[in-house]
Amino acid sequence: SPCEADVCVVQFNAGWNSGNDVEWHGKLKDCEIKYIDIAAYPDVASKYEIVVVPTIVVFNGKEVKRFQADISFAIAATKSEVQEVVDGILMDQF
């Protein structure tokens, strides 16, 4: 995972698509938040097989789930859907 913490949510996007940045990404709780510009880090994009931006990937050491944009380069997933995945990981740790 590209993160320091175990539980981490990464938004992969590109500068040219910044109008479709996922605004609520930084408001997720109980996880590390990371933003990676694939235009600046193409090697990271290929390592994680990012084919469309934005893509949000939830990691718990390794990839747990990904949410990908549709053909309009926007993500349909909601903050609560992604937070649910994070909460599920944390619940499993107890």
Task: Give the predicted meaning of each segment.
Residues 23-26, 49-51, 72:
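Short, glycine/charged-enriched secondary-structure capping and boundary segments
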Residues 1-34:
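Local sequence-structure signature of Cys/Sec-based thiol-disulfide redox active-site neighborhoods
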Residues 15-18, 40-41, 63-64, 72-73:
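Solvent-exposed loop/turn segments at secondary-structure junctions
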Residues 10, 34-36, 57-58, 66:
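Ordered hydrophobic segments in well-structured contexts
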Residues 48-59:
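Structural micro-motif
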Residues 38-46:
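N-terminal post-signal-peptidase region of extra-cytosolic proteins
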